[in-house]
């Protein structure tokens, strides 16, 4: 009888501890544009202890920006809330295996994520072609 009660307690404790992580973690697929049709990726969205949105963007099969037509120098990650201008979040670097990762934290809950190919490392606005996109609906 004690074993059954202990198992129930442990199961309950696990559910209580894991539920918040499951409730906040969500994976959104990135949609590739015709500029990079073979690219794949996703955005893992979580929440930190302060209620901010944690973003972990992962891509694979994304060609180096210099191999695009027209060639670019950098991939830039942008966030855009509805009815506002996109804001640059930083560079997405692609390694020799055509994979890359980008991590950041934001106060935004519902927003679009896009990746563009740019000639400047710190552009004020997206000028180059969009290569990947996703819509985050965290609510």
Predicted regions, residues:
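N-terminal targeting/export leaders
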Residues: 2-3, 23-139
